[in-house]
A protein has these predicted regions:
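ATP-binding/phosphotransfer module of carbohydrate and carboxylate kinases, centering on a glycine-rich
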Residues: 1-14, 37, 42, 57-64, ...
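Short glycine-rich anion-binding loops that position phosphate/pyrophosphate groups of nucleotides
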Residues: 18-21, 70-73
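Metal-dependent catalytic neighborhoods of phosphoester/phosphodiester hydrolases
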Residues: 22-30
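A glycine- and small-aliphatic-rich helix-loop capping segment at beta-alpha/alpha-beta transitions
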Residues: 30-38, 60-64, 79-84
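Short loop/edge segments at beta-strand edges and connector loops
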Residues: 46-48
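Metabolite-binding pocket within alpha/beta catalytic cores that recognizes anionic/polar moieties
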Residues: 52
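Short beta-strand scaffold segments in enzyme catalytic cores
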Residues: 55, 66, 72-77
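Glycine-rich phosphate-binding loop plus the immediately following alpha-helix
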Residues: 82-126
């Protein structure tokens, strides 16, 4: 953002992003100030990615909005507002159904011998056991690293072990998140997963 030149003619900015909104007021205010420096308007709102998803999926309607991407999240929304949110808890404690959870379970299954694709997986990513452990425990953004294995999962979805991994992850998302909302409401999802 700092490298962008100022932009004229913009009357308002609505930004929806992960790590923004009411839950993260300091980060939201910092981003709002940075946006204000590039757009000649003070009509700038910074909100959560979940609120953006809810508004995109349901507008002024009512339903359950879900994000399945690097992480996962869900909410009950009505009239463009979030009424209830089951906390996602991040990739270590939650994020069921997310790319990070799928990647974590893939690596676990491969190295514990439950998924018979070890050599193909390591060759496809130019990795070894030590490198994976280093990237997960000693470098930032382990969630993104784990989520980067989602295309491998997609490419091998016909493998019974991979198919079961995916189904189990989505069942976990439903049982730990969707089950906390009224069952009669419709559910919509978006995201890279």
């Amino acid at each position: 953002l700092a490298e962008l030149p100022p932009c004229d003619g913009v009357t308002s900015v609505r930004f929806y992003g992960a790590g923004c909104g009411e839950t993260f007021p300091e980060a939201s205010e910092k981003l709002r100030r940075e946006l204000e420096a590039h757009f000649e308007t003070t009509d700038i709102t910074v909100e959560s990615d979940l609120l953006g998803a809810a508004r995109a999926l349901w507008g002024r309607g009512e339903g359950i909005a879900c994000i399945l991407g690097t992480g996962s999240n869900s909410c009950l929304c009505r009239d463009g507002e979030i009424l209830k949110n089951v906390p996602p808890l991040g990739y270590v404690l939650g994020d069921e159904g997310s790319g990070a959870a799928l990647g974590r379970n893939l690596v676990n299954g491969i190295f514990k011998g439950h998924i018979p694709l070890k050599e193909e997986f390591l060759a496809a990513h130019g990795l070894n056991y030590e490198e994976i452990i280093r990237r997960v425990y000693r470098e930032p953004y382990a969630n993104r690293f784990l989520a980067s294995f989602a295309p491998f999962i997609r490419a091998h979805i016909d493998s019974p072990e991979i198919r079961e991994l995916v189904l189990r992850s989505f069942r976990d998302f439903a049982s730990r998140n969707l089950s906390r909302y009224p069952a009669e409401l419709p559910v919509s999802l978006l995201g890279g997963v």
